[in-house]
Amino acid sequence: MKLLTKAWYQTMQDSGMGVMLQVDERAAECSEELFQAVWEEKLAEDLELRREMCAEFEEVFDEAQERQSFAEQHRWEMEYYRTRMPESILNQVADLRVLALGYCTEAVFRALKEYRAWCETWTEKTMDEAWKMRCSQGLESAFTGEHSLHDSVVLSLQREGEDLRMEFDREDPMERLRDIRENDPELLEEMGEEPFLFPEIRAICFRDAEILKQEQCVEKAFWLYDEIWRTEEGGFEIHALLWKDNGVFELTIRCRDTELLWTVPQADIP
């Protein structure tokens, strides 16, 4: 990726940093007594919420498991703030443990609000630049056109002679329609069949292709964002940003051309 990089994606995620924090001036001090008090307070709230949810959905409430999950989430929050929060803001935090439980001072709250605004502005500006670069190459409708692959799950990437074929996890449109017929016939009568037979990209064939960069196995990865660039030879480079449980990674494929395969014939696309 040249513009929509891993750093760009992480900054976009940071635009939500601390959005659920509450101002509590107790967070201005660092003491074991305060931390334990806040811990018990937040743990009690979490357990009560989980207990109510289990009762509503008729599930077994496992307090020991919920306590463990609470502690694991707290560790995750601490690591996130420690590694992602700007140092200038982190230095204002008296006790990271209390911050990870959801409390901060007014000064930290305001600083994070400004940082979130900067993240949002910068990521949107970069997204606009990526689109302008695509348009400047005459590639507005190239690759997938108006059909986004965002959040599509990759099933496989396999070599077929000189080509590469990438398959996506897609629901069969007829299966979707049968499900609606069985479970919501009134909706089908109201809307008709056509809205449920919408086309989706089920596979992409990269013609005369080579992989220039593949940081992880793409199987079961979520496709996030992509860029397309013309090559000097007249072909294309497809840059993709994908996500799996162990993080975001990049895939770059150079090819002569691409062919899209649909869940319904392309000629039938409205």
Where are these regions (language model features)?
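Surface-exposed, interaction-prone regions used to assemble/regulate multi-protein complexes
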Residues: 1-270
